[in-house]
Amino acid sequence: MAFMVKTMVGGQLKNLTGSLGGGEDKGDGDKSAAEAQGMSREEYEEYQKQLVEEKMERDAQFTQRKAERATLRSHFRDKYRLPKNETDESQIQMAGGDVELPRELAKMIEEDTEEEEERASVLGQLASLPGLDLGSLKDKAHSTLGDLKQSAEKCHIM
């Protein structure tokens, strides 16, 4: 009970008195960081090693994501003929140079490319004209072809 009162009120009381008490809590300063966390020295070292490894993995994943984004930006710069950015190139090189885009991003780029190819075609240009009914044009073309085939068959029989 005394421990709980000391932990709850002790810090506030020290702040109030301005730590005039001198060295009454110096015994806690002698503990190592491992003992303060309730671990043995070996456990603490293993814990620190795991923390370092996890940090390295997170940094590697972060670098990979940055490189993927840089690859996407450079793709769009090439696509729209914008000037290249050296920071993007350096991010790609930091990740190992060969960066694959995630499936979703690659799918988006592929869809954009297909749409642009469709717009670049003659039918895509015709479809973009206002007041032009592409469906009726196709129907007329098919009926004309059908009429031509029938007239060609009649001539061939004679």
UniProtKB/Swiss-Prot annotation:
UniProt GO molecular function: neurotransmitter transmembrane transporter activity; SNARE binding; syntaxin binding
Major subcellular location class: other
Free-text description of this protein's post-translational modifications in UniProt: Farnesylation mediates presynaptic targeting.
Coiled-coil zones: 39-74
One term under GO cellular component: presynaptic active zone membrane
List of residues that carry Cysteine methyl ester: C155
Localization per Swiss-Prot or TrEMBL: Synapse; Cell membrane
Lipidated residues (S-farnesyl cysteine): C155
Alphabetical UniProt keywords: Cell membrane, Coiled coil, Exocytosis, Lipoprotein, Membrane, Methylation, Neurotransmitter transport, Prenylation, Sensory transduction, Synapse, Transport, Vision
Membrane-protein topology: Lipid-anchor
Region: Disordered, residue numbers: 13-47, 74-99
UniProt entry tagged with the keyword Glycoprotein: no
Biased composition, class Basic and acidic residues, residue ranges: 23-33, 74-87
GO-annotated biological processes: insulin secretion; modulation of chemical synaptic transmission; regulation of neurotransmitter secretion; regulation of synaptic vesicle fusion to presynaptic active zone membrane; synaptic vesicle exocytosis; visual perception
Propeptide: 156-158
Family assignment from sequence similarity: Belongs to the complexin/synaphin family.
PANTHER family assigned: COMPLEXIN, COMPLEXIN-3
Assembly behavior: Binds to the SNARE core complex containing SNAP25, VAMP2 and STX1A.
Its job: Complexin that regulates SNARE protein complex-mediated synaptic vesicle fusion. Required for the maintenance of synaptic ultrastructure in the adult retina. Positively regulates synaptic transmission through synaptic vesicle availability and exocytosis of neurotransmitters at photoreceptor ribbon synapses in the retina. Suppresses tonic photoreceptor activity and baseline 'noise' by suppression of Ca(2+) vesicle tonic release and the facilitation of evoked synchronous and asynchronous Ca(2+) vesicle release.
Protein's name in the database: Complexin-3
Source species of the chain: Bos taurus
Lineage of the organism: Eukaryota, Metazoa, Chordata, Craniata, Vertebrata
Gene name for this UniProt entry: CPLX3
